[in-house]
Curated annotation (Swiss-Prot):
CID domain boundaries: 1-133
UniProt biased composition (Polar residues): 298-323
Coiled-coil stretches noted in the UniProt entry, renumbered to this chain: 177-255
Region ranges (Disordered): 257-387
Alphabetical GO biological process terms: mRNA 3'-end processing
GO molecular function: molecular condensate scaffold activity; RNA polymerase II C-terminal domain binding; RNA polymerase II complex binding
Sequence positions bearing Phosphoserine: 372
Recorded family membership: Belongs to the UPF0400 (RTT103) family.
Biased amino acid composition, Acidic residues: 353-365
Top-level division of the source organism's lineage: Eukaryota
Protein name: UPF0400 protein C337.03
PROSITE patterns in UniProt: CID
GO cellular component: cytosol; Mei2 nuclear dot complex; nucleus
Amino acid sequence: MALTPDTVSSKLATLNETQESITGIAHWVMFHKRYADEIVQIWLEALYESSSNKKLLLLYLLNEVVQQSRVKKISEYIDAVSPYVVNSVADAYASVPASIKTKIKYVFDVWCQRGIFSKEILLSLQERFNNAENSGHSNYYPVGPPEWAPYTRLMTQTSLYAKSAHSTKTVVDALYKSYLEKQSDYSELLDNYKKQLNKASESCKGNYQACIESRSTLITSLESLIEEQKKLLSEEEESLKSVESIISNLENKESTTATSTLTDAGFGDKSSTAGKHNVETTSPPSSSPNSDDAYSPQVDSYSPSINSVPYTSNIVENPSEDNLSPLPPPASGPYSQEEEETSLFKSQRKEENEEESKELPEDSDIYGKDSSPSSDDSSAAGLYGDS
């Protein structure tokens, strides 16, 4: 008969406070050491769900099993329970009355004295015991959240069936091999092998059928769990999209409000004012036709200041050609070179005429009797251009 979760649970349910009960069930558990992982899982569930007194009995059973394992150098149960012993024992300690706490501490002291578990596990347990005095009962569940308990039981059950089926299959293979090797032996011996082979084969068949049924149920349950999780995932994705839409709308509204504020302050439509701004900055300053700056030539840097009087120390009443100060270099301006030379010639001609008029008598008649210049004299004097 295959070992099932119900079989293990029923065996644990018969546990009582007598030494015979604790020792007897411990021997039965040790016999099924190849199912150590599954039996430990069922023990953890029973510890979590039991009353305070039953929790203490289950811890006594664990103590008996791990101590026998240490003496007999069997590692299956110690290895199977080590990942859970801190949380499970500490949670049981936190949930029981003070009188039972004292007895659990006694079991813990035995583990420390005999080094049943590693030093790290024992130190962690000691710390959890100290914290439990202040924090009370924890929310620990031995095999995950409580809502996962049905799936965990199915997995444990399937694992038990699979191990039982594998174990009986090994027996069937060995018996069948022996049966083939002893074909020439006595018929009575062959009949004995045949009976054993039939019995083992039927047991193996039942184990595999139970395993297949349990695994199919587990797959159906997991598929249902996956569908439920997919539905929750879809709802969460829709909620995320809704939140992102709200955030996007808020950002757009803030952007619109900021643009409206800039427009009201005169900084809104920059494209409409860009042309005007460019025209105003690039247009030259307007000048009046009568302004002195309208046609003023540009002056080089060596020209005197407008407020200073140039050449003051060299000014004489009747300057002659010898004592004239040298002319400043011609300034670049709107006049051409030809116009500058004509202006200079007229200035020199005017100075020569003034000197000649000073040398003549005041009442001399330079034009004859009628004191009117002739066209020849005017032409000779340079008043007209060449005809």
